Amino acid sequence: MFLTLIAGLISLLLTALIMPHFIKFYQMKKIGGQQMHEDVKQHLAKAGTPTMGGTVFLLVASFVSFLFAILFFSHGKSMGLITGILAIVLIYGFIGFLDDFLKIFKQINEGLTPIQKLSLQIVGGLIFYFLHVVPSGIDAINVFGFPVHLGLLYIFFVLFWVVGFSNAVNLTDGIDGLASISVVISLLTYSVIAIHQNQYDVLLLCGIMIGALLGFFIFNHKPAKVFMGDVGSLALGAMLAAISIALRQEWTLLVIGLVYVFETSSVMLQVSYFKYTKKKFGEGRRIFRMTPFHHHLELGGLSGKAERWSEWKVDAFLWSVGAVSSLIVLAILYL
C-alpha cells in the first residue's frame, strides 16, 4: 500500500505540474474548444475552454505505471496484467484523441463516425482479450459469487463490457468535475477490493490513476480551466471495465458505476420514447428535460419544480450516488 501511495502522489504532482503548461500552450495556439449545449445557458461561457486534458493525465499515469511495474512487478503474471490494462487504456485514449482531434483541429463536428469509433473500440477490446483474458484462462462471469461459464462466448461479453462502459463514462463527462471524481470514487472502491484479493498490481494501477485524476481535478473543478475530452473519458471507462474483469468482479461495475449506467440509460430511454411517441402520436415526447441525466438535473433538479441546479449541486448529488452505491457493493462483499 505504501508503494501505491508513493506512486499515486508522484502521478498527482506530475499531472498538476504539467497541466498548466498544456493549458497555456492550448491558449497560445488559440485552438478551438469543446462545443457547448445551447439549451444549458450556463455552459455557453465555457466555449473555448481547452479540452483534451485527458492526454496529460493518461500519459503521466501510463509512464508512472510502467516505471513502477518494471521496478517492482517485472516477474510473474503481474506484468502481463498491468500491460493488458494499460494497453486498453492507451488504445481507447488514442481513439478519443482521434475523435477530439477531428472535432477541434479539423473542425469536423461529429469527429469519428459511429462506425469508425465502434470498430476501433472493438479492436481495442480484442487486444485486451488476447493480452490478458486468454493468458489468464478466464471464461466465466462472476454473478454475485457464482461463476457463469461462457467459454468462447466470453469474448463477446468482454467487448460489450469494455465498449459499453467506455461510452458510458464518456456520456457522464458533461459538466465540470463530474466524470473525474466519479471515476476516483469507482477506483477507490476497486482499490479496496484489490487489497482484499491481494491484487497489488491492480491496486497500483488504481492508485496511480487516482493520483493523476486528482491532479487533473485541480484544473477541472468549476469553473473548469480544462476538460478531459474523449481522450480521457473513453480511456477511463475502458479501464474500469478492464479492472472489473481482472478482479473477477464484473457485476460490481453495474452498481459501483451506477451513475454511468443511469446516464447512458437516460439517453437510450429518451431517444426510444421520443421515436415511439412521434410514430404513435405524430409528435415526439420526452421523459427527461434533457439528456444525459446530469443536464436534466441542471434544468430543474429531480422534481422539475426546483430552480436550476448549479453544477456543484449536480456534482455533489451524483458523486453521493456513486459513493453510496460503492459502499453497498463493499457491504455485500465483505460484511
UniProtKB/Swiss-Prot annotation:
Chain segments annotated as transmembrane: 3-23, 53-73, 78-98, 118-138, 143-163, 175-195, 200-220, 226-246, 251-271, 314-334
Localization annotation: Cell membrane
Primary localization class, coarse: membrane
GO molecular function, one term: metal ion binding
Cofactor(s) in the UniProt record: Mg(2+)
GO CC entries: plasma membrane
EC number(s) from the headed UniProt entry: 2.7.8.13
Annotated S-S bridges: none
Catalytic reactions on record: UDP-N-acetyl-alpha-D-muramoyl-L-alanyl-gamma-D-glutamyl-L-lysyl-D-alanyl-D-alanine + di-trans,octa-cis-undecaprenyl phosphate = Mur2Ac(oyl-L-Ala-gamma-D-Glu-L-Lys-D-Ala-D-Ala)-di-trans,octa-cis-undecaprenyl diphosphate + UMP
Biological process per Gene Ontology, one example term: peptidoglycan biosynthetic process
UniProt pathway annotation: Cell wall biogenesis; peptidoglycan biosynthesis
Similarity section: Belongs to the glycosyltransferase 4 family. MraY subfamily.
Protein name, UniProt field: Phospho-N-acetylmuramoyl-pentapeptide-transferase
